[in-house]
Amino acid sequence: MEMENVLIVDDEVDICYFLKRNLDRKEYTTCFVNSLKEAQKLIDEDRPLVLLLDNHLPDGLGLDFAEKVKRDYPEVKIVMITAHDTPKDRISANRNGIDYFISKPFMMKEVFRALDVVINRA
């Protein structure tokens, strides 16, 4: 499997470590940050293939950030992982360029399925 570059953006450090540890085992190249400001810097420098993005971060909403990322870097795939899962949230996610939506709490098999879908989507 070719190693894919994944950026994890979540303010919950335990979730970041959990995702990183499990993704590293599956040969993904990962790193994580805890704010949108840090995420923007890494995206500008390294252009990850996939962004695993929480919606509620200390410096803003992931949905708003996703819209900007998709405008500037349309090739970046975005998987939103959030505890806020209402029909309105899913509609907003779809409109803002989210490629896949996962509700917290989640299982790693959901994350692996999401990555498989967005990476292999034609």
Residue ranges with predicted function:
Residues F106-D116:
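C-terminal output helix
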Residues V13-C31:
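Two-component/phosphorelay signaling modules centered on CheY-like receiver
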Residues D64, D85-Y100:
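Alpha4 helix (beta4-alpha4-beta5 surface) of REC/receiver domains from two-component response regulators
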Residues N34-S35, L61-D64:
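Acidic catalytic/metal-coordinating carboxylates
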Residues C16, P58, T86:
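The feature encodes the CheY-like receiver
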Residues R47-L52, L57:
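Active-site beta3 strand of CheY-like receiver
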Residues L63-Y73:
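Short amphipathic alpha-helix used as the core "switch/output" element in two-component signaling
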